[in-house]
Amino acid sequence: MSRPIQALIDPAALERNLAIVRRHAPRSRVMAVIKADAYGHGLLCAAEALAEAEGFALLELDAAVRLREAGYRQTILLLEGFFDIDELSWIEQYRLSTVVHHPEQLAMLEAVRRRATLDVFLKLNSGMNRLGFTPTEFPAALEHLKANPAVRQITLMTHFACADEPDRNDSIAAQLQCFNLAAGGRYMPRSLANSAAILRFPEAHADWVRPGIMLYGSSPLAHTTAEQLGLQPAMTVSSRIISVQTLRPNDGVGYGHAFRAGSSMRVGIVAGGYADGYPRHAPTGTPVLVKGRRTRIVGRISMDMLHVDLSEIEDAGVGSPVTLWGRGMPVDEVARAAGTLGYELLCAIAPRMQRVT
């Protein structure tokens, strides 16, 4: 028998969330971001649910190869590009597209100029200051690619730093202006908008949008919930109570007795801890569902177990179902209580946790 903790993946939710992307950007092609094992949801499971997207974006070359070998014919984009010249033969063989964001990649492309045919996304650093050519470097990089016979098609791209922050619209306007100036009057396909920009900045939709977190049912916006956006959770992490303890006043529970009972109370011990991907730093008070009713985490999260307050759920006992996040318990709410983001919780699901659909 396996432990009762599992991640239930809902392909229908992925499909519905993709439909919301299209509703917001009806004239753009969709590059579904499925990096980090599709944000913890499973690469091929997510790809099947998102098969209507015109493209997939990820980081790992081996994952891109798996997609092609599974029969997906869409554009498949490597978001960090290639790291070694030997990877270019794989990129060509599997008809992958690659981001180019620094001069060393240009040099490697130059070395195979007579031996390859590649589609390239040229990245501008418009203010994120992470990857990409500066506005000064960008025109020369573009001309370099245009002169290289190995390069078949060029798409221009950038990435927004503050699209999720409603009081930082000036930052987005500045990045958009920077991109438009660097691109000039050249007609080439363009890709700018991540999830937050898809929802907030239609002027940035361009030819390709790149939704990530919104596909998985988490909100990219700090002050708007996934439910308000119509997004549905694609992952529900559930478990069961495996033991019940009755605490007397001032009894502690778990390591360090970080929580002590103020009065007599029942505590449920749940199969699930930080080795499964639940955040160790989640404090007492972090919300959880037991038998579909809200209660709270108490005490310190341990490697394999956590503790829930059963004071108001008198009929709960060993075997009672627990929802750690997902349907009925938004991952963003749990993340906020733990001082992190829904992105991190979804991506942190441990390999030992069973995923089911």
Swiss-Prot record:
GO biological process: one example: D-alanine biosynthetic process
Assigned GO CC terms: cytosol
Positions with a binding annotation for substrate: R130, M303
Gene3D superfamilies reported in the protein's UniProt record: Alanine racemase, Lyase, Ornithine Decarboxylase, Chain A, domain 1
Entry similarity comment: Belongs to the alanine racemase family.
Catalytic activity: L-alanine = D-alanine
EC number: 5.1.1.1
Cofactor(s) this protein cannot do without: pyridoxal 5'-phosphate
The organism of origin for this protein: Nitrosospira multiformis (strain ATCC 25196 / NCIMB 11849 / C 71)
Residues annotated as catalytic: K35, Y255
Highest classification ranks of the organism: Bacteria, Pseudomonadati, Pseudomonadota, Betaproteobacteria, Nitrosomonadales
HAMAP family: Ala_racemase
Pfam families, alphabetized: Ala_racemase_C, Ala_racemase_N
Enzyme class: isomerase
Involved pathway(s): Amino-acid biosynthesis; D-alanine biosynthesis; D-alanine from L-alanine: step 1/1
UniProt-recorded name of the protein: Alanine racemase
